[in-house]
Each structure stands twice: as C-alpha cells, then as structure tokens.
C-alpha cells in the first residue's frame, strides 16, 4: 500500500544505483537500503542479481542451488485466558520452543499424528487473545519466481494454515503442558501465517551489492533482527561490523557456512 517500487535507475559509467523508480516517479539517491522480508526476491530481481548461488561444499566442489526458497510459516492462536501461562512470579513467560522425537497423538481423536521429529513454539498473544505460536514451516514446492507473495498473510487465497495445523499444534501444546489438554476447541479458526523468503542456507544476508545497495535479507527472522539497523548504518558510513561479517553473500562460494 502506498508508493510502489517498480525498478532501479543505474549510472551510465558504473553499476551503482542512482535512483529508485516508483509509480510516483524517480527518487534520486546516493545509497539504497533494502530490508523487504518476503519481498526480498522482488528487489533482488529488479537489481538483476543472480537467480542461483554457487556453494562450495566440504568436498571442495561447487554446487549450484536456487537463490531463494519460499517457506510457509504456520501460526495460530488458542483462545485461553490471557494469564493462562502466567509464571509463579506473576510475570508472563518468554517464548517457549520445543523440539521432540516423542510420538505425538491428537488431543481430540487420540490418533497418532506423527512419530517423526516435530517442533513448536508458543507464547502469550500480545493482543491478549490467548496463546499464540506455530510449528515448523513447510517448503513451498515451486520455483521462487512462481510463488505469489501478494496478497500477503491473512489476505492470501493460496497460503493459509490448515485444519491439520490446528490439530497438530494444539495437540503438541497438550503434550508439552497438561493444562492444554482438552482445549483444542478453543483454537481461533481463521486465516493466519505467511510466507518466508529463505536464503540458500536459511541464514540472513547482510551485504553491499552494485556498489551502493545494502541488502538486509533477514530470512524472515523478524524481530530477532531488530538490532541490525544500527550495525548496518555504521557499515554504510564505513565501519565494518564483526557481527555482520559472517553473513556476507560470498560465504557461499567460500564454503564458509
């Protein structure tokens, strides 16, 4: 919504971007910072950057893979009381992550859901609607250029959580904490979740391209990346960050994964 970026204007004697093309006109610039989450692919394509990555394996050989892979991030809310997870000290708990190899049975039907490794996370919903969380995402089985990112999230007609997610996540909650047993019917049905645009190794890329374009491809780690803004700003001004250095694009060809 608002101004739409349609492309980039480049200098005649260099690869540097001199302007950002939008549906409202061209915005001249000296530096460009792209931090677009699931839309990283679109800006990458506009900048005409490579659609594949060459990765040096442990065997010393080069392997070619797609630059991007879309994952469907499955999330939901179970409508328990806002203080359902309150700790003994009266405070709300942190985000809880659980990975398990124990067989998982349905809280509703008691049938086996999976006997393979599974994982969930959950926390109090920030809007007080209950407990919010999700399971492991699944890979979208399409070439990244054929994935419809828009309309995004709850507006997407194609990418939504399913009844199978509902049963699995609520059952996993009951498996982890007895207080969730018999609460599956409180799951708030409705559109949720969204697409994530993943790099070849599912770790972020923080790097400069085309001389003056700084790409923050956070691999949809979201709020966990909230501290990078200051580090990126310092890099643009000439101070390299030791924290961001391992996440350069050339790590793939170097095999430094």
Language-model-derived ranges and their functions:
Residues 1-6:
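A conserved beta-strand/loop element that lines the FAD pocket in flavoprotein oxidoreductases
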Residues 139, 143-148, 157-257:
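C-terminal catalytic lobe of FAD-dependent flavoproteins
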Residues 8-160, 174, 180-183:
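Flavin-dependent oxidoreductases
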């Amino acid at each position: 919504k608002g101004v739409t970026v349609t492309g980039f204007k480049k200098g005649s004697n260099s690869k540097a971007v001199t302007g950002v093309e939008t549906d409202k006109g061209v915005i001249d610039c000296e530096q460009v910072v792209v931090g677009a989450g699931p839309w990283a692919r679109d800006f990458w394509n506009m900048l005409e950057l490579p659609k594949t990555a060459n990765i040096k394996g442990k065997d010393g050989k080069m392997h070619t893979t797609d630059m991007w892979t879309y994952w469907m991030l499955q999330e939901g809310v179970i409508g328990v009381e806002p203080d359902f997870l309150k700790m003994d000290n009266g405070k709300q708990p942190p985000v809880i992550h659980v990975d398990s190899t124990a067989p998982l049975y349905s809280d509703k039907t008691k049938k086996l859901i999976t006997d393979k490794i599974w994982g969930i996370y959950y926390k109090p919903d920030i809007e007080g609607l209950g407990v919010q969380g999700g399971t492991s995402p699944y890979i979208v089985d399409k070439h990244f250029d054929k994935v419809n990112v828009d309309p995004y999230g709850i507006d997407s007609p194609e990418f939504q959580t399913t009844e199978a997610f509902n049963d699995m996540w609520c059952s996993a909650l009951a498996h982890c904490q007895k207080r969730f047993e018999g609460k599956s019917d409180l799951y708030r049905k409705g559109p949720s979740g969204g697409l994530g645009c993943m790099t070849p190794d599912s770790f972020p890329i923080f790097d400069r391209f085309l001389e003056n374009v700084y790409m923050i491809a956070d691999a949809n780690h979201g709020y966990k990346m909230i501290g990078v803004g200051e580090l990126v700003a310092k890099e643009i001004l000439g101070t390299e960050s030791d924290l961001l250095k391992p996440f350069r694009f050339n790590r793939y060809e170097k095999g430094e994964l």
